[in-house]
């Protein structure tokens, strides 16, 4: 189906707005994946706060101009599925990585975060806000307990020397 100029401009504007508000983007090739599987992926994406869209490469190049995802333009070859993470930088990468494990024909082409091309594995392993806070609290708790143990041991040694 041929798109007229207004349709193309609307697509570019929509994708550009999505790109400006996104934390990260992941590019994939979904050739050969069944419609049922893609529907499942789209549903999972909505639940994870990820917006997905299949866009023509020429329109996508125009849409990402001036955004943090301009570095991905070299990966816009063949059918391109782009996903923007809106709530957590690793959400789209984690979603695509898990989907690619279950679907051999699904190929992840690249990912971008903070204006640089990133490894999908790196983005997928980024902790969520809650996970990062939990790790920090665990580290602080361990440090406090360790300091208490060292203080008690030093006090015990001091008492033994005095005796």
UniProtKB/Swiss-Prot annotation:
GO CC terms of this entry: large ribosomal subunit
InterPro entries per the UniProt record, alphabetical: Ribosomal_uL10, Ribosomal_uL10-like_sf, Ribosomal_uL10_bac, Ribosomal_uL10_bac_type, Ribosomal_uL10_CS_bac
Origin superkingdom: Bacteria
Alphabetical keyword list: Ribonucleoprotein, Ribosomal protein, RNA-binding, rRNA-binding
Molecular function GO labels: large ribosomal subunit rRNA binding; structural constituent of ribosome
Stated family: Belongs to the universal ribosomal protein uL10 family.
Subunit (UniProt): Part of the ribosomal stalk of the 50S ribosomal subunit. The N-terminus interacts with L11 and the large rRNA to form the base of the stalk. The C-terminus forms an elongated spine to which L12 dimers bind in a sequential fashion forming a multimeric L10(L12)X complex.
Name this polypeptide is given: Large ribosomal subunit protein uL10
UniProt source species: Histophilus somni (strain 2336) (Haemophilus somnus)
Gene: rplJ
């Amino acid at each position: 189906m041929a798109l007229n100029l207004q349709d193309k401009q609307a697509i570019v504007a929509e994708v550009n707005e999505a790109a400006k508000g996104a934390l990260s983007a992941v590019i994939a090739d979904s050739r050969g994946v069944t419609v049922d599987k893609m529907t499942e992926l789209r549903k999972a994406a909505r639940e994870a706060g990820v917006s997905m869209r299949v866009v023509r490469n020429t329109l996508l190049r125009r849409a990402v101009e001036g955004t943090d995802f301009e570095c991905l333009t070299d990966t816009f070859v063949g059918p391109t599925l782009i996903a923007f993470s809106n709530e957590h930088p690793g959400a789209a990468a984690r979603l695509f990585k898990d989907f690619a494990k279950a679907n051999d024909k699904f190929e992840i082409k690249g990912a971008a975060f903070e204006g640089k091309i990133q490894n999908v594995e790196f983005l997928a392993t980024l902790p969520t806000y809650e996970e990062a806070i939990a790790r920090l609290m665990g580290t602080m708790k361990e440090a406090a307990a360790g300091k208490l143990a060292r203080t008690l041991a030093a006090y015990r040694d001091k008492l033994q020397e005095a005796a």
